[in-house]
Design a protein with these regions (language model features):
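Conserved C-terminal alpha-helix-loop-beta "cap" of PLP-dependent enzymes
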Residues: 217-256
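Conserved PLP-enzyme active-site core in the AAT-like
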Residues: 12-216, 221, 227, 232
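General structural signal for secondary-structure boundaries
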Residues: 1, 124, 178-179, 251-253
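Short, small-residue-biased leader/transition segments that mark boundaries at the very start
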Residues: 2-7
């Protein structure tokens, strides 16, 4: 159980933060003259890295809606090296069809790496590599640790690529090496990952259903609700719908 994430996904390397993991993976894949297709709905620091950081070093990034497969296909170029997505996405729980995105990207160029941030789902609910993704990144600060006392991240994928991340992206480019005590705490947390995720999912579903009927709530974003635009895809590629949700209040910011 302690190593279920790595066993399922072949190999992984630990980092000192989620952004350390993401940055290490992307710097291993991309460089000057390369192109990345990324979803426009991302964790804020990931968006900043792609939109402001990598462009300083000659990496072109095109932001698209990865739930729109035609948009993904149209954005691919000869120099595209990666397609980056989160599913479920932060903060609106948007769902992308991992298998379909991977089929499009690899059909265009087998060398393109499909990178999936699996933080909101965790390995207990979703295995992107089994769906066709090449690389999976996690912020272990959240579900994988589960106790709120660690900042950490993981990059997961084929052993040869993870070796490159370890020696170049992590060691040389970011230096975001996990400390031993953080590793110990995460191993502790992984023991209860599956049972914690069961409770997270049950709680989120109950809250989402309550908010969905609340007179002051305009819209609830939770893939477990049948009217969520990504419900059917989430039901197909996830074991359950996750523990995260967001919502809008009627009247917008002024009402909140």
């Amino acid at each position: 159980r302690q190593r279920q994430m790595c066993i399922r996904d072949r190999a992984c390397v630990a980092a000192a933060s989620g952004m350390g993991a993401i940055s290490s993976a992307l710097w291993t894949i991309a460089g000057a003259g390369k192109h990345i297709v990324a979803d426009g709905t991302l964790y804020g620091c990931t968006f900043a890295l792609l939109n402001h950081g990598m462009s300083r070093y000659g990496v072109e990034v095109s932001f698209v809606d990865t739930s729109d497969l035609a948009a993904v296909k149209a954005a691919l170029k000869e120099n595209t090296c990666a397609v980056y997505l989160e599913t479920p996405a932060n903060p609106n729980l948007k769902i992308a069809d991992i298998a379909a995105v991977a089929e499009i990207a690899h059909g265009y160029n087998p060398a393109i790496k499909v990178v999936c941030d699996n933080t909101f789902a965790s390995p207990a609910l979703q295995n992107p590599l089994a769906l066709g993704a090449d690389v999976v990144v996690h912020s272990a600060t959240k579900y994988l640790n589960g106790h709120g006392d660690v900042i950490a991240g993981f990059v997961v994928g084929k052993a040869d690529f993870i070796g490159e991340v370890r020696m170049f992206g992590l060691k040389d480019m970011t230096g975001a090496v996990m400390d031993p005590f953080a590793a110990y705490l995460i191993l502790r947390g992984l023991k209860t990952l599956e049972i914690r995720m069961e409770r997270h999912c049950a709680n989120a579903k109950a809250i989402a259903e309550y908010l969905d009927k609340h007179p002051a709530v305009e819209k609830v974003y939770y893939p477990g609700l049948k009217d969520h635009v990504g419900h059917d895809i989430a039901a197909r590629q996830m074991k359950d719908f996750g523990g995260m949700l967001s919502f809008e209040v009627k009247g917008g910011r002024a009402a909140g």
